[in-house]
Amino acid sequence: MNKVINNVFAREILDSRGYPTIEVEIELCDGAIGRASVPSGASTGKLEVLELRDQDEKRYCGKGVLKAVQAVNGIIADEIIGMNAADQNAIDKALIELDGTKNKSKLGANATLGVSLAVAKAAANSFKMPLYRYLGGKQTSVMPVPLINIINGGVHADNKLDFQEFMILPVGAETFSEAIRISAEVFHNLRSILKKKGYSTNVGDEGGFAPNIESTEEALDLIIYVIESAGYSAQSDFALGLDVASSTFYEDGIYKFEHRDLTSEELTEYYCNLVERYPIISIEDAMSEDDYEGWKLLTAKLGSKIQLVGDDLFVTNCELICKGIEEKMANAVLIKPNQIGTLTETFAAIEMAKSNGYKAVVSHRSGETEDTTISHIAVASNCGQIKTGSLSRSDRLAKYNELIRIESALGKDAKYYRGLAWVL
């Protein structure tokens, strides 16, 4: 009886870009409280569930979320007060049925996710368990490799780079804490080198630097130099990752990339060339979400060599993941809880990926909050990878710091993920 939901309350707060988002608090009959806030993306997939905004230009440039807040404080509260917070499946099923639409357009996925996450946190607190243990059980022990965004481009930055993210993966570290330490050293070395070269050291939405670099190769060469001049190897200590976000420069079947018009075949050959020349082990959204043939070609060419992550292609949706598996598109799935709208559906997407030999990468969004739930999801699911921005901006560091705490709590049971060895 103590796990029964007694009170539900939502409010409007601000995300890392200064735009409104929703925060939800759930209180149980035993006094346990769970609080969760919801992120927002800039580069979004067409088939993501709906983020409900007010569209009132007189408030927050139309981006207010009072409608979502009202949905939580009204119709959702009426439905779930009195329910058992420990039955996450039942809570999420009630939210899905209450919304009644395929894309959660009635209540908004920001409303449903805020409630779903807050309920899980309240239940975990009631059981006096850390969230990762409550969600993952006793077998939870794998600390994820972070995919750390150190150079921003695309829609995340105001520069000439078409690719959205250039990432370092500290695959050679022994522990998560060591992974963060060596990555921070590389990050600060990059800042110093950019400053010496006369580049801006301002950071983008996700905390990476956004210098006015001319080309992809120039960015990759710079990162290799920065890693090695920091005293590390770009072969054994670190590997590289890219988030291309190719849908942003895909038009009428052509990729308009660096002043060139490329077909899917030509872009695939370009990636093959990059992989030969640089220690790249992960490429996200290498093809547009609409370019299925391009995805199939790319997967056939590079799928046995590196990790090919589908974000816009899959949008954390089991139906789309299943289709991708059947048609041999990509070999990994990016997991963003706000793309699907409930915790249960998020874990279902992770399980579908893993059970079919695909890897799962838990991810933040470009508009974040100080909420650290994704850190717990990454550990609870044993998925082994997390993408949560750079080593600046407190909204990104909150996730890394929480993972350091989790590793400390796990003690000798903590195991740093080694599942990327197949691509080294």
Curated annotation (Swiss-Prot):
One of the record's GO molecular function terms = magnesium ion binding
Keywords assigned = Cytoplasm, Glycolysis, Lyase, Magnesium, Metal-binding, Secreted
Q: How does the cofactor attach, per the note?
A: Binds a second Mg(2+) ion via substrate during catalysis.
Active-site residues, as the UniProt record annotates them: 206 (proton donor), 336 (proton acceptor)
Against Pfam families, the record matches this protein to:
Enolase_C, Enolase_N
Ligand binding (Mg(2+)): 243, 284, 311
Residues bound to (2R)-2-phosphoglycerate are: 164, 336, 365-366, 387
Catalytic activity from the UniProt record: (2R)-2-phosphoglycerate = phosphoenolpyruvate + H2O
Which InterPro entries does the protein's record reference? Enolase, Enolase-like_C_sf, Enolase-like_N, Enolase_C, Enolase_CS, Enolase_N
Name the coenzymes or cofactors required: Mg(2+)
Q: Identify the EC number(s).
A: 4.2.1.11
Cellular component (GO) terms are: cell surface; extracellular region; phosphopyruvate hydratase complex
Tell me the leader sequence span: none
Cell compartments where the protein resides: Cytoplasm; Secreted; Cell surface
Q: In which pathway does it act?
A: Carbohydrate degradation; glycolysis; pyruvate from D-glyceraldehyde 3-phosphate: step 4/5
User: What domain of life does the native source organism fall in?
Assistant: Bacteria
Extract the NCBIfam families matched here: eno
Q: Which family does the similarity line name?
A: Belongs to the enolase family.
Task: Indicate what this protein is called per its UniProt record.
Answer: Enolase
